[in-house]
A protein has these predicted regions:
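Non-catalytic interaction/regulatory segments
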Residues: 1-204
Length: 204
């Protein structure tokens, strides 16, 4: 109690043309989805993301981001507004969907590439980790994609412990280590198929 909702630090990587954003906060269900949603609302593109969750409930999210035009987002006032919006979302004063509706344009969720998109693909692996089901998602990259994915995982009752986000040309390759509300892997074939189909429908 008495702690700030978050601490945020940004570092511009001029040569690589992205900004590294480090967010420290307290873990809560759907946290990564909230972060992805606020970024999307501000038209900030997430190139990569690493989530680190400690046993005491503290979370460190490190994101590599740029603008939808592939440029560094350099205006300090934009970052101040984004931090304010994140704080309000974390504290429950603002809902992410409302923020997106207020700040975004009709082109939201449209693919960023003009190339014909490759089919979206989702793979599940219960062998690579002892504690988590690993979901690999290959999808056409677009602003708001990560928010769509993480919001859907939350709605399906999945908790993200580790995430590895990468974008190559026009396709995102996102990896999520997940478990259910009881901390168990997802092993039921019917549930796995439901998760896959729901994600594919949302990503259309």
């Amino acid at each position: 109690r008495g702690r700030k909702a978050l601490a945020m630090q940004i570092e511009h990587m001029e040569e690589a043309k992205f900004t590294e954003v480090t967010i420290a906060t307290i873990d809560s269900p759907g946290l990564f989805s909230q972060i992805a949603g606020v970024m999307a609302a501000h038209s900030i593109n997430i190139l990569g993301a690493q989530i680190y969750t400690r046993k005491d409930g503290d979370v460190l999210d490190v994101l590599q981001v740029n603008s939808v035009h592939g440029e560094i987002v350099s205006k300090p006032e934009k970052w101040r507004k984004l931090e304010d919006d994140l704080t309000e979302v974390f504290e429950g004063r603002v809902i992410v969907e409302d923020l997106i509706g207020k700040l975004q344009t009709p082109s939201f969720y449209t693919p960023k590439s003009r190339h014909a998109p490759r089919p979206n693909r989702i793979e599940f692996d219960n062998e690579v980790s002892d504690n988590y089901t690993v979901i690999d998602i290959f999808a056409t990259d677009k602003v708001g994609l990560l928010y769509q994915i993480t919001r859907t995982l939350k709605e399906l009752g999945l908790y993200i412990a580790v995430s590895k986000i990468a974008t190559k040309v026009d396709q995102a390759a996102d990896v999520f280590y997940v478990h259910d509300i009881f901390g168990q892997k997802i092993v039921d074939p019917v549930r796995i198929d439901t998760i896959r189909q729901t994600l594919l429908e949302r990503l259309e």
